Amino acid sequence: MQLVSIFLFISFLFLLRKWKKYLNNSQTKKLPPGPWKLPFIGGMHHLAGGLPHRVLRDLAEKYGPLMHLQLGEVSAVVVTSPEMAKQVLKTHDIAFASRPKLLAMDIICYNRRDIAFSPYGDYWRQMRKICIMEVLSAKSVRSFSSIRHDEVVRLIDSIQPCFTSGELVNFTERIIWFTSSMTCRSAFGQVLKEQEVFIKLIREVISLAEGFDVADIFPSYKFLHGFGGAKQKLLNAHRKVDSIVEDVIKEHKKNLATRKSDDAIGGEDLVDALVRLMNDKSLQFPINNDNIKAVIIDLFAAGTETSSTTTVWAMAEMLKNPSVFAKAQAKVREAFRDKVTFDENDVEELKYLKLVIKETMRLHAPVPLLVPRECREETEINGYTIPVKTKVMVNVWALGRDPKYWDDAESFKPERFEQCSIDFIGNNFEYLPFGGGRRICPGISFGLANVYLPLAQLLYHFDWKLPTGMEPKDLDLTESAGITAARKGDLYLIATPHQP
């Protein structure tokens, strides 16, 4: 007991010293306004009991669109207006181009050797360029069209028997399986044998990567990092994921060794390309197994979670708004009335469906706080100082619901985009579902392709209804916690095959 008391006393003195240092620093710099703080934990108590993007939106209404928030020992700034977002993502983009350390990404992505969470620099540029060239470019995305077609056929075939048996369709589960299979075949060249386990592990990691864990708000207090159990869960998930991906890499190395040299580049998937580049002596940063694993996990997490989240939200919002659902389905069936099958080129003509997806991503940005940035150099914005190492969060969920920029902001109205030039590429700072600037998501084309085609096919081939006894007003649109804001709870529906 005496040893415990001594330990607690020493810890208290250490924390007190840190707190005094923070107070001295904050008094010498004009930080943005923010909510009141408590010793040691700062403003963490303001986030208790709510989803961070919602709580931070409410706080910003009181303290302003550039708000300071002390998260334990981490100084953070929250951006909640298009004007301030432009300052961070465009005007001072280079100053805010790096990423803060997050425990989940350090563990699961091999000390941030991925792309999304890698610090800004030459390594990030090299790996981003490789991934864009090999799998994320428009040309590469088009080359995967036959894979998407195959997976959509499998998706439709898996739903058909539910009508005969009277079983509800777990729409969420089917869409996650489609997007994960699509991503697997693009990255690995095949569906994983352990795909179900792999999906579960990646989703678990995503749920733990919110950035508000004890280790993320007290990074220098290593003795606290085990509290709450998140670190152990991440380590367990990492071991299992590492084993699965290691087997994939070994298989690709074996196949590459037996493949004819003149056929080495034709028909490559991402792992093939990365394995081949392991022997490229011209690379500034040589590629090893851990680099490949980190990039694979990155692509899989982003490619699966964001696309599936958007597709599920789109269906939920359409069923919540029956007139939108009826119009979207009618447009699809009218466009393909005389066709036995249709492909991605045909889907490009479905203008109303594109409006539905745009509106879905306005209300339900896949990553509501974007992936946080870190200030690389002291910067002044709107008369306030943003110190080096400040964590910067852009609340794109709040931007998409700001009544100053969106008429009837909380309502689902795809038609609002009809006479509007707003797009996904980060030039409109009131609408940033994929972020903006140097760290904009490089997989926009890949992600959207995995939403448009399956949603169009599902609207064409099935009549969708809520479970018996449930009205549109009863449909729950609550979000789950995590770095992504997926719908809380799986979406169960009745699917009746359509006979043209």
UniProtKB/Swiss-Prot annotation:
InterPro entries: CYP450_71D (IPR052306), Cyt_P450 (IPR001128), Cyt_P450_CS (IPR017972), Cyt_P450_E_grp-I (IPR002401), Cyt_P450_sf (IPR036396). Its cofactor is heme. Coiled coil: none annotated. GO terms for molecular function: heme binding; iron ion binding; monooxygenase activity; oxidoreductase activity, acting on paired donors, with incorporation or reduction of molecular oxygen. Keywords: Heme, Iron, Metal-binding, Monooxygenase, Oxidoreductase. PROSITE patterns: CYTOCHROME_P450. Gene3D superfamilies: Cytochrome P450. The keyword Thylakoid does not apply. Its EC number is 1.14.-.-. Heme binds at residue 441. It is an enzyme of class 1 (oxidoreductase). Pfam families: p450. The keyword Metal-binding applies. Belongs to the cytochrome P450 family. PANTHER family: CYTOCHROME P450, OS08G0105600 PROTEIN. This is Cytochrome P450 71D7. It comes from Solanum chacoense (Chaco potato).
